[in-house]
Amino acid sequence: MAEENVIFVGKKPTMNYVLAIVTQFNNNSTSRIVIKARGKAISKAVDIAEITRHKFIQDAKYDEIKLDTESLQGEKGESNVSSIEIVLTR
């Protein structure tokens, strides 16, 4: 899958990500978008997928949802961070 079909969710406003997904579906004639998030951004990723499906692209479907836990090495030692990967198809 091309790297431009992946949306990494962070601290930007929710609608920025929704707009990016809608733009990719409409302009790039892609049929598959992956939304990725870790930690506190997981709930925002779910909101983004739901807003996209219900308000903008009603024919979008969930193809796959992956949940995972990643071990990250930080200043305070190793910590586990949850991650999600939501695949939307059209």
UniProtKB/Swiss-Prot annotation:
Gene Ontology CC: chromosome; cytoplasm
Gene3D superfamilies registered for this protein in UniProt: Alba-like domain
Modification note: Acetylated. Acetylation at Lys-11 decreases DNA-binding affinity.
Molecular function terms, GO-annotated: double-stranded DNA binding; RNA binding
Function comment: Binds double-stranded DNA tightly but without sequence specificity. Involved in DNA compaction.
Family stated for the protein in its record: Belongs to the histone-like Alba family.
Identification of the protein by name: DNA/RNA-binding protein Alba
Record gene name: albA
